[in-house]
Amino acid sequence: MSDVVKTVIGQRLDLYKLLELNYKDYKGNDDAATTHSLKKQYRKLSLRYHPDKNPGPEYIDRFHLLNLAITVLADPAKKAEYDQWVAQYLYPDNGLSEAEQTRREALVQKLNASERKVREDNQGGNVADIGKIQNYGEKLRRMAHFGLGFGDWRNLDEHISRATTNTIEDSTTDKEVCTLRAVFDFQSIENISDPNNLRRYMNEVFPEYMYDIDEIRYSSNNVYDGEEDIVVYIVLKDPIKTGRLYHQIKRNPPDAFVEIEPYISPKLFESFSKEIPLNDHVKNLLRGVPEVIDLD
């Protein structure tokens, strides 16, 4: 069983209900028409709940769950694994009437919500963690101010975990300046949606950067239907190596690359060309001139 299906089952998520669909209409259907219908519904809801339009935490959480749902249900193998669990635990054929089944589902959801609350209450927290989460929130607000996309919301939990465990510097500036936004031709790399395959491709094409690529993330807006290009964020460990890789791809892009750009556009800094002189107080501090304090 795939890791993403294990995650969904572990959280007892009803992916069909998240997509505002009836499980019975899709049970056992894995054909192209079913997949197309699921993706169409996902696109409609993703526009409604996208964090770029609705920055509230409830929208962020819902958007993350929508991405989780389409990742599982649009893949026939993952959908088959998930449907087997759904048929056994969420919607078992137990001879209950429709009204009785509805009441059973409500009780199960209430129990699951109660169990989640107990787990969350037992996890606790501390002031330092809250401070780091607030700093991460400030970062998201700055990105919204400059019109930057919010990146890969498919792995939102991973981003929050990183922001609350690393230093502020590690989770913001360094990561951003070392990130490249790459657009790939979907058909150019076999099973491009698998980060291991994409990393293997990068190692083959750019072996000199094999140990410099720190992470590979996927945009939440990707649609893995073979007809659209795929947006990927490539994070390196060193800003100098990031610049070298960027210029190397720009000069001689491999066939799989459609586009490559820095994650933070240099255009954002064009308005900072004006020189502003330092005031005398700051100049004295930089020169090491002692500051006179009036004690009267």
From Swiss-Prot:
Keywords: Chaperone, Cytoplasm, mRNA processing, mRNA splicing, Nucleus, Spliceosome
Domain J stretches: 14-86
Family per similarity comment: Belongs to the DnaJ family.
Organism: Candida glabrata (strain ATCC 2001 / BCRC 20586 / JCM 3761 / NBRC 0622 / NRRL Y-65 / CBS 138)
Quaternary context: Associated with the spliceosome.
A biological process term (GO) from this entry: spliceosomal complex disassembly
Highest taxon of source: Eukaryota
GO cellular component terms attached to this protein's record: cytoplasm; spliceosomal complex
Protein name as catalogued: Pre-mRNA-splicing factor CWC23
Physiological role: Involved in pre-mRNA splicing. May be involved in endoplasmic reticulum-associated protein degradation (ERAD) and required for growth at low and high temperatures.
